[in-house]
Amino acid sequence: MLVIGNGRMITQDASNPFLENGAVAMDGNTIVMVGVTEEVKKVYPDAEFVDAKGGVIMPAFINAHEHIYSSFARGLSINGYNPQGFLDILDGLWWTVDRHLTLEQTKLSAYATYIDSIKNGVTTVFDHHASFGHITGSLNAIEEAAKDLGVRTCLCYEISDRDGMEKSRESVMENVNFIKHALADDSDMIAGMMGMHASFTISDETMALCNELKPEGVGYHIHVAEGIYDLHQCLKEHGKRIVDRLHDWNILGPKTLLGHCIYVNEHEMDLIKDTDTMVVHNPESNMGNACGCPPTMRMVQK
């Protein structure tokens, strides 16, 4: 039995949202009592007590769109690198990084990200991974770090045709194999999704392969309209907007995550809402890559 108390408690309970001097009692993985510190200690006098010392006690955060592979690129300066737009940033930085990662480097990147997450109150991480220099086994390498540190995590590999169809197919199988592995895990700490980069690097052939091989019961995790080129390419090559294309491929739904959604219109927002698809807002990334601002509040209103 464990009691954490003497903290300002945010409960997420509408009837009692805040306690100035709150405590929470836990029996294993189950919260058994929430209340004023002295009252909780009276009920569980023999429990181990952790003094929050006036800090905040609240449910942990969930990071719904992470890129573990980028953790060691923070603050990286590349000689001669002078991007003129988002595509230059992708090819000159992020795709260059992911093409050179080894399994060991992927695992170390996961440790760095998960430790940073724990320090900042994040206990669940949805990671969208890419390491095109070493695809097979990369999700298991990340899983090892997550299990070692006790972080709940949902992993996927970023399927893309950008480095050729052979690597694209290998990426599909990395997702499929990890999803099956995660579905067989009964720890409630590991899950998998079918990861996709973005519409502009995924052909209809690859879309069809993902649809065919994705195990039942899981969704997709994909970047949508992060840059304007993604939208322009989809209109030119497929004659439709990105969310419409995803809908036509049965990718939308309550288990699917759409990252960014900067350049979406009213119709696409309605389609996202009608299919109960989830959107992840990434303001720090959008600023860092100078991609723009999504219609976040409009989506919230809908």
Predicted region positions:
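N-terminal metal-binding scaffold of metallo-dependent hydrolase/deaminase domains
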Residues: 1-43, 55-57
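Active-site gating loops and adjacent loop-to-helix segments of metal-dependent hydrolytic enzymes
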Residues: 72-106, 163-164, 228-255, 275-278
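Metal-coordinating catalytic core of metallo-dependent amide/deamination hydrolases
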Residues: 129-262
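Active-site-adjacent C-terminal substructures of enzyme catalytic domains
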Residues: 251-302
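Divalent metal-coordination and catalytic microenvironments
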Residues: 7, 24, 29, 54, ...
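Alpha-helical scaffold segments that flank or form the walls of functional sites
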Residues: 76-128, 133-151, 173-186
